[in-house]
């Protein structure tokens, strides 16, 4: 696995104060694979590091500074992932049966989708590609139940 961005340098690059809690939150985000909810990130922190409201504020700051991406599940839950050179933009898959959302490989340049032009005067801030359907585990379970 590639070496991730150094937490203190990331914080300094956006001009915010480096604190132990922010370093621990960034390291927790970098250590995991895939998407996190604010609650899951809070659960990965040592007790007393930061309250849940602080985690939400920090994630909002990372999104605002374009260091994290926010993905909204069909259930309305917000998921976050780092948006750095080690984690380029990529599509996701959301299972409608179990609710799991996970990362798919990034499109290769020759596979990139062509989107229609944005209306004149509009400014695009982000594009999100989420495949929705039934994951392989849920499909296998359904097929097994159908055979019984």
Predicted regions and their residues:
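Short, Lys/Arg-enriched N-terminal segment that forms or immediately precedes the first helix
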Residues: 2-15
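Short helix-capping/hinge SLiMs at alpha-helix to coil transitions
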Residues: 16, 30-33
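Short acidic, hydrophobic short linear motifs in intrinsically disordered regions
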Residues: 35-43
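Short helix-coil junctions and helix-kink-helix linkers
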Residues: 43-50
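Basic amphipathic alpha-helical segments that dock to polyanions
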Residues: 55-65
């Amino acid at each position: 696995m590639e070496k991730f961005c150094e937490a203190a340098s990331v914080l300094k690059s956006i001009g915010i104060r480096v604190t132990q809690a922010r370093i621990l939150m960034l390291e927790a985000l970098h250590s995991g694979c895939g998407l996190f909810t604010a609650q899951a990130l809070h659960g990965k922190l040592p007790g007393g590091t930061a309250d849940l409201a602080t985690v939400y504020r920090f994630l909002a700051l990372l999104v605002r500074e374009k260091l994290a991406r926010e993905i909204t599940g069909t259930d309305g839950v917000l998921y976050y992932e780092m948006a750095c050179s080690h984690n380029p933009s990529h599509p996701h898959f959301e299972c409608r049966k179990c609710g799991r959302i996970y990362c798919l490989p990034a499109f290769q340049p020759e596979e990139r989708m062509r989107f229609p032009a944005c209306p004149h005067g509009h400014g695009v801030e982000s594009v999100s590609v989420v495949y929705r359907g039934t994951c392989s585990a849920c499909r296998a379970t359904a097929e097994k139940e159908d055979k019984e």
